[in-house]
Amino acid sequence: MKKQGLIAVDLDGTLIDTVAVNAESYRRALESFGFTLDYDYYAAYCNGRHYRAFLQPLMGGNPSAEDVERVHDLKKQYYAANMDIARKNEALFVILEALRPTHYLAVITTGSRQNATEMLDHFHCTDWFDLILTQGDVVNNKPDPEGYL
């Protein structure tokens, strides 16, 4: 059967609620560098933003680019251990499962390919998607629309 169109969804906060997963992973990573992170602060000011934009203020305002990357790399290591606290959007999963035979499916995220794939694998839906677009696949991350174009 020929597919009729494309459905593109965001991963974090749309397909899967990953706020707690990311907050805990960043909290642990930052803690190992001597910094603290509160869940409410993360949810209000960091969630959905690219890590380079929000880690600098959390790391004293002027950390080296290398230290920012070290924190992010450590966060990616903690991510898998925290996936059990993620919650899938049950209604959206039902819709996508019903439409996948007739539509191409894409998931778009500002997250890393590693974390996106781990999360989709955790919910047994990686193979649903014809395209997984991550931060490494675009020049301009969300909120720029590049990933959707």
Regions found by a protein language model. Name each.
Residues L58-V94:
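Metal-dependent phosphoesterase signature
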Residues I85, S112-L149:
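Substrate-recognition "cap/lid" segment bordering the active-site pocket of phosphatases
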Residues A29-L30, H50-S64, M119:
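Helix-loop "lid/cap" segments that line or gate small-molecule binding pockets
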Residues K3, A80-V107, R113, T117:
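Short, acidic loop-to-helix structural element flanking the phosphoryl-transfer center
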Residues M1-A44:
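Active-site neighborhood of HAD-like aspartate-dependent phosphohydrolases
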Residues Y26, L55, L92, A116-L120, ...:
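Hydrophobic packing residues within well-ordered alpha-helices of enzyme cores
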Residues R49, P101-T102, Q135:
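Structured helix-beta-strand junction loops
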Residues V21, H50, Q114-N115:
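Short alpha-helical
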